[in-house]
């Protein structure tokens, strides 16, 4: 959910940018996702997305 996304981003970037700046970041941060993550933060978003996919099964 959005609250978890906010907490994940704040933890990952140590407050260097506002969490909403990542709502459409890379390939996986924000709605949906596909392709190869562009960096560690994007990989973190992919892991989060994958977890939600598995939980929904």
Curated annotation (Swiss-Prot):
Matching SUPFAM superfamilies: Phospholipase A2, PLA2 (SSF48619)
Function: Snake venom phospholipase A2 (PLA2) that inhibits collagen-induced platelet aggregation. In terms of inhibition of platelet aggregation, superbin b is more potent as superbin c, and d. PLA2 catalyzes the calcium-dependent hydrolysis of the 2-acyl groups in 3-sn-phosphoglycerides.
Keyword entries, A-Z: Calcium, Disulfide bond, Hemostasis impairing toxin, Hydrolase, Lipid degradation, Lipid metabolism, Metal-binding, Platelet aggregation inhibiting toxin, Secreted, Toxin
GO molecular function, one term: calcium-dependent phospholipase A2 activity
Pfam entry (one): Phospholip_A2_1
Name recorded for this polypeptide: Phospholipase A2 superbin b
Example GO biological process: lipid catabolic process
Keyword Metal-binding among UniProt keywords: yes
Family, similarity comment: Belongs to the phospholipase A2 family. Group I subfamily. D49 sub-subfamily.
Catalytic reaction equation(s): a 1,2-diacyl-sn-glycero-3-phosphocholine + H2O = a 1-acyl-sn-glycero-3-phosphocholine + a fatty acid + H(+)
Transmembrane segments: none
Keyword field contains Metal-binding: yes
Principal cellular location given in the protein's record: secreted
Disulfide bond residue pairs: 29-45
Signal peptide: none
GO cellular component, one term: extracellular region
């Amino acid at each position: 959910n959005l609250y978890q996304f906010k907490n994940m981003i704040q933890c990952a970037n140590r407050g260097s940018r506002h969490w909403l700046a990542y709502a459409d970041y890379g390939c996986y941060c924000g709605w949906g996702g596909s392709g190869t993550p562009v960096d560690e933060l994007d990989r973190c978003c992919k892991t989060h997305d994958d977890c939600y996919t598995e939980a929904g099964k």
